[in-house]
Structure formats: structure tokens, C-alpha cells
């Protein structure tokens, strides 16, 4: 590594979000928008010459990102080379750099004794700089194999499959049942966490590279699978996980109780259809809101509700409160099961002084005017 003593000399410094009091008034991304490149170079120097980089092991990055390599390249101000290494393993680092929970940081060797390297921040800065500098462009395919492939579903898996198959020279057509391409990238992750302009930017690149996209088409209904088999040499099913985890209890079917997928999708679609003006039919405006579930989806629901202006908001967590640090039965390099406060909780605390209420027994009965369950 370029600076072998970096992890001894420098503390972890994480890039900050926009101020809470400002960001709760809009649906823009919570990120500040500008990267402190010199600070990120220093943070890259904290990456150790650890021998076995657990950050890209089974407990770390699931796509085997070459993390130590691009950390060191960033430290040496070789951003374009860092982008080249990042794109070796990651089709869409602008997505993962925003929404990935960063298991790589949980298994960082430095994390045994000190706060981990800011891998996620560095990844996002690399790809954002790549777009800003014009380094990321459509990669035209010069030779075609003559084979045709249908991809069913346009979420992250479908887009990645389409990208890989297209670069191999196959002609790819992606079918999406919704009115917009992107799957859960478009309709599952709130705008403030993943701006839809970021999603559209990548889709436009893929389209320019020769991938064809078909929306409003439900395979099995609008087109039979036998028809696809007749038209294509191969079919890839990447249909996603849009079915909600239910929480059966008395009054479950009462009006005003919604699964997170329905709630988040309605909000995002309303914003996209109405020029970023929320006309969500499930709006929490003026209501007493309970969000059941305190994980990533829960905090997305909290953040969405806060922007809609609820009368009150309470968050229930079904699990008992985890420890602040690792427990003995949760050793490194496993993902650290610890108490976390994310952007939505921070916003709710600012507005309502939110106290996360932990319960160990299942919810028995709904007796409220408005609830979103995010298990």
C-alpha cells in the first residue's frame, strides 16, 4: 500500500449528509452532493496491507470488489485507474455506493481494533467523479453473436444481466411489467436515498449500448412464455422480491394499514408523475403514524412519512435491542449485529424526539389510524 502507516495516523472521517432541518423539506438525495476528494484520499490511505482482505471475502463484499486496489489508487490520486478497477466487478457502483449496507466495512481488518476504512464513501466518490469527468460513457458493442436473449424484470439483477449479456455481443431485450424501468431501484428505494435521475442516467447508457427496454408488459399475461421461447435463444428471469412480509394480527385488513412496498411505491410514483410534488394516496400528512420494523426499509418509511408531515410518528421494532458493539457470539468478520440509527431515525428524532420502542412479543391487534409495516 502507498502509505503503510495511514491506519495508525488517521482517524475515520465519514462524509456527512445534508442538514436534517433542510433535507426533510424535500425529496432530494440526503447526500451533500460534493465529495471532499483530499479527505477521501487520506481515508484511502487507512486501508492496510492486511494480507488477506476480508473486505472482499464471503463475509464482505458479495460481488468481490477489488477494494484494497482502488483504495490505494485513490490515495495516490489515480481516480481514473480506480474507476477501471471498480468497474471490473461492479456494473453499477453509483447504486451500491448509495444504498449498499457496506458489509465490506463490517469485515474490514482494521475494524478489529479501530473504526473501519470508509469504503462505501470512497466507492461512491470514484463513480461520481467518473461521471463528472466524462469517463463513463456508452460502450458500443462492435460484434454481435447473432443470439437473442430476453430478460424478464428490470431491477438491479435484470439490468446487470442485460449489461453483461449485451457486452458479450448478444442482442438483449428487457421486459418490465411496470411503467418505468428500474424495478426496486425505481419504485422501492426512496428518492432521497437514490435519486431517480441517477437510475435514469444508467438506463440511458444501457439503451445507448444497444439494450432494448419494454415496459407495461407482464410476462405470462401480455406475452406467453411460449412466445418468448419461440422468439429468443435464452430467457433470464430476474423478477425481484416485491411480495411483502405480512404481519397477521387482529384488524390487519383495516383501512390505513399498508405494507412498506405499497407505501413507498405509491410515494415514489406520485413524485415522478407529478413533477416531484407528492400527491400520494397513502400520504401520512396530518396522521398519527406507526412504522413497524426498524431496519433499512423501516427507516425509508420513516423518512418518507416525515416529509409528508405526520401529526405524530412512532417506530416499533420487533426484535430486542442489539448491543452497541459486537457481542461474543457475533465475532469479526461477520456482519456486526449492533444498534444503528439511520437517516430516517435521525430525521424523526429531530422532528418528534422519536424513541425507538422495542417489543419482544408479536403485535396482536391493530388499533391505530395509520400504520406501515416494514418487516
Report each predicted region and the residues it spans.
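Single conserved hydrophobic/aromatic residue that forms the stacking wall/gate
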Residues: 357-375
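Rossmann-like dinucleotide/flavin-binding elements
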Residues: 45, 151-175, 214-224, 229, ...
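Gly-rich Lys/Arg/Thr-decorated short loops/hinges at beta-loop-alpha junctions or inter-strand turns
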Residues: 21-23, 180-187, 253
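Glycine-rich phosphate/pyrophosphate-binding loop
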Residues: 16-37, 270-273, 280, 369
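N-terminal Rossmann-like dinucleotide/flavin-binding domain of flavoprotein oxidoreductases
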Residues: 83-90, 122, 185-233, 337-360
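Immediate flanking context of iron-sulfur cluster ligation sites
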Residues: 32-56, 79-103
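Iron-sulfur (Fe-S) cluster-binding segments and ferredoxin-like electron-carrier domains
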Residues: 5-29, 54-81, 103-128
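FAD-binding core/adjacent interface of flavoenzyme oxidoreductases
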Residues: 70, 93-152, 167-168, 199, ...
Amino acid at each position: 500500500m502507498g502509505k503503510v502507516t495511514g491506519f495508525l495516523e488517521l482517524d475515520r472521517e465519514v462524509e456527512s449528509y445534508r442538514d436534517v432541518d433542510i433535507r426533510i423539506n424535500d425529496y432530494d438525495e440526503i447526500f451533500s452532493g460534493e465529495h471532499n476528494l483530499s479527505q477521501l484520499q487520506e481515508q484511502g490511505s487507512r486501508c492496510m496491507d492486511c494480507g488477506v482482505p476480508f473486505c472482499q471475502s464471503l463475509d464482505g463484499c458479495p460481488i468481490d470488489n477489488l477494494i484494497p486496489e482502488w483504495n490505494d489508487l485513490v490515495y495516490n490520486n489515480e481516480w481514473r485507474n480506480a474507476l477501471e478497477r471498480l468497474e471490473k466487478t461492479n456494473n453499477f457502483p453509483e447504486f451500491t455506493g448509495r444504498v449498499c449496507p457496506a458489509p465490506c466495512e463490517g469485515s474490514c481488518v482494521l475494524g478489529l481494533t479501530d473504526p473501519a476504512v470508509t469504503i462505501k464513501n470512497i466507492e461512491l466518490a470514484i463513480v461520481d467523479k467518473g461521471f463528472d469527468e466524462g469517463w463513463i460513457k456508452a460502450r458500443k458493442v462492435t460484434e454481435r453473436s447473432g443470439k437473442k436473449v430476453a430478460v424478464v424484470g428490470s431491477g438491479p439483477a435484470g439490468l446487470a444481466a442485460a449489461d453483461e449479456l449485451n457486452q458479450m455481443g448478444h442482442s438483449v431485450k428487457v421486459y418490465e411489467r411496470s411503467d418505468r424501468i428500474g424495478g426496486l431501484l425505481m419504485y422501492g428505494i426512496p428518492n432521497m436515498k437514490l435519486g431517480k435521475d441517477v437510475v435514469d442516467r444508467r438506463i440511458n447508457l444501457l439503451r445507448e449500448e444497444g439494450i432494448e427496454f419494454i415496459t407495461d408488459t407482464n410476462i405470462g399475461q401480455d406475452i406467453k412464455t411460449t412466445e418468448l421461447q419461440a422468439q429468443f435463444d435464452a430467457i433470464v428471469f430476474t423478477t425481484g422480491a416485491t411480495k411483502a412480509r405480512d404481519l397477521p394480527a387482529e384488524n390487519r385488513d383495516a383501512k390505513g394499514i399498508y405494507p412498506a412496498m405499497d407505501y413507498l411505491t405509491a410515494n415514489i410514483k406520485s413524485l415522478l408523475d407529478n413533477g416531484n410534488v407528492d400527491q400520494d394516496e397513502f400520504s401520512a400528512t396530518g396522521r398519527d403514524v406507526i412504522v413497524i420494523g426498524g431496519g433499512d426499509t423501516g427507516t425509508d418509511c420513516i423518512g418518507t412519512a416525515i416529509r409528508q408531515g405526520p401529526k405524530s410518528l412512532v417506530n416499533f421494532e420487533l426484535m430486542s435491542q442489539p448491543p452497541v458493539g459486537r457481542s461474543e457470539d457475533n465475532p469479526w468478520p461477520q456482519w456486526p449485529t449492533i444498534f444503528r440509527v439511520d437517516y430516517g431515525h435521525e430525521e424523526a428524532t429531530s422532528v418528534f424526539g422519536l424513541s425507538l420502542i422495542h417489543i419482544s412479543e408479536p403485535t396482536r391487534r391493530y388499533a391505530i389510524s395509520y400504520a406501515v409495516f416494514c418487516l
